[in-house]
Amino acid sequence: MIMCGITAIFNIHDGAQALRKQALLMSKRIRHRGPDWSGIYQGKTAILAHERLSIVDPASGGQPLVSPDGKLILCVNGEIYNHQELRERLKGDYEFQTGSDCEVILALYKKKGIDFIEDLNGIFAFALYDEEKEVYLIARDPIGVIPLYIGYDDEGHLMVSSELKGLEGFATHYEPFLPGHYFYSEDRKLTRWYTRDWMDYANVKDNPTDVQQLHDALEAAVKRQLMSDVPYGVLLSGGLDSSITSAIAKKYAAKRIETNGKADAWWPQLHSFAIGLKDAPDLIAARKVADAIGTVHHEIHYTIQEGLDALRDVIYHIETYDVTTVRASTPMYLLARVIRSMGIKMVLSGEGADEVFGGYLYFHKAPNAQAFHEETLRKLSKLYLYDCLRANKSLCAWGVEGRVPFLDKEFLDVAMRLNPVAKMCPGTTIEKKILREAFSDSLPKEIAWRQKEQFSDGVGYGWIDTLKKITSESVTDEEMANAAKRFPINPPQNKEEYYYRSIFEEHFPSESAARSVPSIPSVACSTAEALAWDSAFKNMNEPSGRAIKGVHESACLLYTSDA
């Protein structure tokens, strides 16, 4: 298992030595993602480079990985959670060289060609080069938990990089590589490999709802994702999602899941981490959860000034000017530095639950089950531009890997096939009620039924309020009036966005960089389509959960009496 950074250059016909130097420069720009080791392969028509953060098989799992016959070369950023099952199935067809979970990709390609990606349960972005056939395959995981960008230069070279900074200045044009897709050089196009029946409302509208099945599926996902040969922890904000993943992780932390619980864990004490301004809502709630489940808890305080001082570095690392993402990434970036300083290289996080279960406060306004379900689909399809990007890049800035059980491939098939009616939260019904019911026995009552806080809200309301004030004072009315002239691509809609965009442009001045960031009107993280749910939404453009008047202020503990 390797969380890392990858870069590659394909379609090389001459000048390979000069391109090797370029590949090394590209790779160096993303070395923060993998500070443990660097590797590079140069072939006839391809160069693949890798920056390694070792999590599983630290001694022999370096990359690029090479097949026993030397003809297949692979760079992977990711985790293959079902690799042991795949190894068992493939051991008669392939001679494994390492203990890396990612080597199963080579074995699968050798046996099945390009038609193997569906066999993988994991999070990944990879580039595979077939030296004998002089073809290559690039692919990305279903939801886009792992970042990847693809680009071209004027000489016709195709390039990929885990972060856009690896392509900025080298590729004439680049863009995010779409999740759930692959690019095969013989086809010369992106092809969607990840499709599901639950992507059509007609296939789920009459489904039953099994709370126990939901419980068991998430527990299995968390357990799967605990495989590690290095110390790990959990991000514990005190919200519902991180509290559930932390409670499940604690249940299994004492034993190594690689041995099916037969051997003691190498680091049996589970460490949990929370960050916020002093007395922030998240910190208070996280303490309660940590005490209840028995983690070794670490509470990190940051000041508003420390957050402001970090903004320029945060935007460089997360590669976006999206307001919500910048707000939430800053405390996570500061926390990741502390986590790494304590020797922790992997953490579980709660991203994805709000998209799967309609946990954002605006979902209260969904007019019917079909609209609700289709909005969850839209939210899932855009996660790679928002929360997945934030979680991955904020943590990887300091060489920490993040895993997200709520976006586990097998769990998604259970959760997204639930009857959407069971997920809805009409009127005063609390959001994610079915998830709360599934795990109400695992958490303190006041946590199981605590209302949704966005991460940037929960770390302390003063953080957002100060950001608005500082950015408003820093950007003049004249600058804002001329925003569309200075930034013709995705013009900023408010002064806070203008401020972040200016910093982003200093780091990444190209048009490709500007186009890589989404810019749509939003209320409390809604998609543009959901603005039609309430006429009041059309007059707002505030991504914070506090935009939903009357919902945030009410302490929504409506079910504590009978939970």
Per-region residue spans from a language model:
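Short acidic/histidine-rich active-site segments
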Residues: I344-D354, Y360
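Adenosyl-5′-phosphate
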Residues: M1-I6, S341-L348, P367, F372-S561
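Hydrophobic (often cysteine-bearing) scaffold residues that line and stabilize catalytic clefts
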Residues: L19, N82, T98-D101, L120, ...
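A generic secondary-structure signal for well-formed alpha-helical elements
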Residues: I30, Q225, A253, I257, ...
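Short, hydrophobic alpha-helix immediately C-terminal to the catalytic nucleophile
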Residues: L106-A107, S243-A247, A336-R337, G358, ...
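Short, basic, helix/turn surface patches
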Residues: A127, V323-L335, L377-L380, T476-M480
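ATP-dependent adenylate-handling ligase core
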Residues: V211, I275-A336, Y362-A371, K393-S394, ...
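Cysteine-centered catalytic environments shared across enzyme families
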Residues: I2-Y321
